[in-house]
C-alpha cells in the first residue's frame, strides 16, 4: 500500500509539473501590429492537451505564427510542446525563420521517431507580411480558411506530419488577405467532432459554421464558433484550438 501511495504521489507531482510547464508555453491570447489583428484560443480536452500555438513580432514588425498539434495528451504531449516552443524561440528573429522552424521541428521529430519515443506532430508556420504576399508552410496540418462577409475560401495544403523523412524540403505557399478578411487556423479536434448520431462534423459543415459565425470582431467570431460547436458535439473528445487572423480596415 505504501508503494502504491508513493507511486500515485510521484505521478501527481509529474502531472502538476507538466501542467505548469504547459500553461507557461502558450502566449497571451492576442497580438497585433499596424496591419493585422490576431486572437488565439485553445480548449484542451483534458488538463494536459496536445495543441500549441505561438506568435511574435519579427524585427521588421511583421508577425510570425506557429500552430501545432501533438498526437495524444498528458505529460509526453506537454514535453513535445515545450520542444516546439524552444525551436520557435530560438529561430523567431533569424532570417528565413519560417523555414528554419519547420526544418528544425522536422529534424527533432525525425530523431524522436528513430528513438524509443514514438510520437507525431502536425504544424504550420505563417509569416504575415505588411507590404507583400504573406506565406504559409505546412506539415500535415489542417487547411487554413479565409473568410469575409461575402465569401469563404480554403487554402489546400496537402502534406504530411513532421519527422517522416530526414532532409525534407518544405513548400512555401503565398497568400494575401484583403481588408477585413479573416484567416482561420485550427486543429482537427473541431472537424473530427461527433454528434449524437456518431456523425463527424467534417470540413464542409465546419465551413458552414464559419459562415454563420463570421464577425469582424474576433472575440465575437470565436465565441460564435464555439457556441455552434457545443450545439453539435455530444462531448469534447479532442483539444480545440483556433487562431483568427484579421487584416485591419484601411491597412
Segments from the language model and where they lie:
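Terminal output helix/cap of sensory domains in signal transduction proteins
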Residues: 221-229
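… and, occasionally, acidic/histidine-rich disordered N-termini of signaling adaptors
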Residues: 6-184, 227, 234-251
Amino acid at each position: 500500500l505504501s508503494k502504491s501511495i508513493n507511486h500515485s504521489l510521484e505521478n501527481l507531482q509529474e502531472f502538476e509539473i507538466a501542467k505548469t510547464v504547459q500553461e507557461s508555453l502558450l502566449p497571451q491570447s492576442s497580438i497585433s501590429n499596424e496591419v493585422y489583428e490576431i486572437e488565439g484560443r485553445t480548449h484542451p480536452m483534458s488538463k494536459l492537451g496536445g495543441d500549441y500555438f505561438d506568435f511574435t513580432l519579427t524585427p521588421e514588425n511583421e508577425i510570425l505564427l506557429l500552430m501545432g498539434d501533438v498526437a495524444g495528451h498528458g505529460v509526453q504531449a506537454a514535453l513535445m510542446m515545450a520542444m516546439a516552443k524552444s525551436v520557435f524561440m530560438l529561430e523567431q528573429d533569424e532570417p528565413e525563420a519560417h523555414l528554419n522552424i519547420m526544418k528544425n521541428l522536422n529534424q527533432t521529430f525525425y530523431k524522436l521517431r528513430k528513438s524509443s519515443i514514438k510520437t507525431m506532430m502536425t504544424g504550420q508556420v505563417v509569416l504575415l507580411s505588411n507590404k507583400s504576399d504573406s506565406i504559409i508552410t505546412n506539415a500535415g496540418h489542417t487547411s487554413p480558411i479565409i473568410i469575409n462577409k461575402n465569401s469563404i475560401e480554403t487554402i489546400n495544403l496537402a502534406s504530411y506530419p513532421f519527422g517522416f523523412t530526414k532532409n525534407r524540403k518544405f513548400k512555401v505557399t503565398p497568400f494575401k488577405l484583403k481588408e477585413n478578411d479573416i484567416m482561420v487556423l485550427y486543429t482537427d479536434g473541431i472537424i473530427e467532432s461527433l454528434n449524437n448520431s456518431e456523425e463527424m462534423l467534417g470540413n464542409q459543415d465546419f465551413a458552414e459554421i464559419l459562415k454563420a459565425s463570421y464577425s469582424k470582431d474576433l472575440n465575437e467570431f470565436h465565441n460564435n464558433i464555439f457556441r455552434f460547436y457545443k450545439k453539435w458535439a455530444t462531448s469534447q473528445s479532442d483539444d480545440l484550438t483556433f487562431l483568427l487572423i484579421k487584416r485591419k480596415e484601411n491597412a
